[in-house]
């Protein structure tokens, strides 16, 4: 799929996750949602990324948005990853990379690290796709992007 831009409708998906049942994006209409795509459980940068979110959970909770991590590993891998590092962000299993493909971040069979903020109307309010997998958007960056997206939505 082509690159998604701010204002585009966020592709809906339903996938297994570490929460109850399955995660379905369209069931979150009316709420802000942060989708944090990362390449893999237990890899060095991804572990740093998810641990940074854990260590700054208060900042992420203060932005009043549901945040989920998404990677190609299955729920069993995600549950082990969460337990090993005491992670606080629930994780979605995109084993076939269908979600990554729908969001335009599947490249050569892997996904790019990315943050998408979805507004209460189900539209992309912010996107940050990393060209290289060595850096990630931290909690401060997510909080700032969400504040900016909320301000833009309020301004109409």
Protein language model regions, located:
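Chalcogenol-based redox active-site neighborhoods
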Residues: 1-156
């Amino acid at each position: 799929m082509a690159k998604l831009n701010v204002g585009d409708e966020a592709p809906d998906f339903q996938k297994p996750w570490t929460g109850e049942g399955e995660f379905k994006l369209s069931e979150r209409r009316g709420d802000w949602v942060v989708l944090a795509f990362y390449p893999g459980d237990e890899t060095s940068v991804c572990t740093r990324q998810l641990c940074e979110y854990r260590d700054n959970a208060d900042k992420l909770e203060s932005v009043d948005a549901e945040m989920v991590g998404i990677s190609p590993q299955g729920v069993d891998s995600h549950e082990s990853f969460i337990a090993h590092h005491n992670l606080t962000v629930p994780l979605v299993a995109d084993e076939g990379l269908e979600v990554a493909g729908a969001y335009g971040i599947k490249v050569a069979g892997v996904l790019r690290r990315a943050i998408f903020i979805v507004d209460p109307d189900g539209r992309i309010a912010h996107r940050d796709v990393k060209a290289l997998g060595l850096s990630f958007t931290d909690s401060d960056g997510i909080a700032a992007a969400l504040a900016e997206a909320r301000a833009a939505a309020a301004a109409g």
